[in-house]
A protein has these predicted regions:
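Catalytic alpha-helical scaffold of carbohydrate-active enzymes acting on polysaccharides/glycoconjugates
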Residues: 2-231, 237-243
Length: 243
């Protein structure tokens, strides 16, 4: 292992020293990106692939999409089949985003400003997602899947808007397909910025936008889930200490 990697690993372990400890043997099951669009549809996948974007090389682009009624119902059914020594089922921490880009409104306004919509509105555009919101509430009430905060959306909105306004071909095509998370090497080898890291910085001016993302995202989380977020995992791990 390189020196830099060793140092990073050591610092990560040291940062955990002040945290909570127990002698119990606990298995933590954490699953993230709930509520987020990754690949909007099979048609979007084919269109991007046929245009030369190597989406087929990314397991996220191949398999990740907005959770459906069946996804949650089958997962809850599976979890409920198991019990620990006290009779309790396993609990998954479902790390959620609560919004997605409002592609239609952004397009209508000529990319003048970023707009977002609650993920519950995104669900309305999908054919088998009518009960997702209710299933989340049921899962939390039954202590099967408990929501945690991942960010407002799984998107660095300021960086994404700069790429759209700058005419990045791959980003513009993905926009037309309702997709934001695409490979870093785009059409014809075009460089594509990392849009998934919502709290990464290009300039210090982005901090003000990110503060608003946190404020509005946490408020929306509480509104949608009926509880305040107690746990936060930044998308892709990037997070500035001044936030």
């Amino acid at each position: 292992m390189h020196t830099a990697a060793l140092k990073q690993n050591l610092l990560r372990n040291l940062s955990n020293l002040p945290g909570w400890r127990t002698r119990r043997h606990i298995v933590v099951i954490e699953s993230d990106d709930w509520g987020s669009i990754r690949m909007a549809s099979h048609e979007s996948f084919r269109r991007l692939r046929d245009a030369g974007l190597p989406v087929e090389r990314s397991h996220y682009n191949r398999f990740d999409g907005l959770e459906s009624d069946d996804d949650l119902a089958f997962l809850m059914e599976t979890l409920a089949e198991f019990r620990d020594s006290t009779g309790r089922p396993p609990v998954i921490t479902g790390v959620n985003v609560v919004a997605n880009p409002d592609f239609d409104r952004i397009r209508e306004e000529g990319f003048a400003a970023y707009r977002y919509e609650p993920y519950t509105r995104t669900l309305q555009r999908y054919p088998a997602h009518a009960h997702v919101e209710a299933l989340w509430h049921e899962a939390a009430d039954r202590r099967l899947i408990v929501p945690a905060f991942h960010g407002r959306e799984h998107l660095n909105a300021a960086r994404w808007m700069r790429a759209l306004r700058g005419g990045n071909r791959s980003t513009l095509l993905a926009f037309e397909c309702g997709v934001t998370g695409i490979p870093r090497r785009g059409i014809g080898g075009e460089e594509v910025p990392n849009f998934q890291a919502a709290f990464d910085l290009d300039t210090t001016a982005d901090l003000a936008d990110q503060q608003e993302v946190l404020r509005s995202g946490l408020a929306l989380f509480e509104q949608l889930h009926g509880r305040r977020a107690r746990y936060f995992v930044p998308t892709n791990g990037y997070f500035n200490g001044s936030l």
